[in-house]
Amino acid sequence: MEKVKVVGFTMVKPASPTPSNTIWLSNLDLFATWYHVPAIYFFRPAASIATPSAADLKLSLSRVLVPYYAFAGRFTSSPDGRREIKCTAEGAYFAEAVSELSLDEFGVYTPSVENCRLLVPAHGSNPSDKNEKSTLFFSFS
């Protein structure tokens, strides 16, 4: 079996209505390079907490997208060319993956392009491309 197998993709929308405004990016954001920097974080659950299912994570994500509604929007440009976030409530891209490996079997995870390719799909990597989804969340079971 592959180290990690992606089994599905879903768009998770906010759990309730959100504002539909436009948010300008800060001057510091405007100087940033326009590409995603893949980052993966592993956390061991507390012994007293049951491991959440993909459905639990999707529900939690939909709830958190209400107060953080900009993350359910899309990058765009204003008529004068300034980069901004259009709060569209389109949702965040959620990828679900499975692996037979335990966290310990992954070994010491070192951030690299090769390791990120094991866990992060290639599409959705260009936040300025309006035809691609720009936010990825993963659930591993």
List each model region and its residues.
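Non-catalytic N-terminal regions of enzymes
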Residues: M1-S141
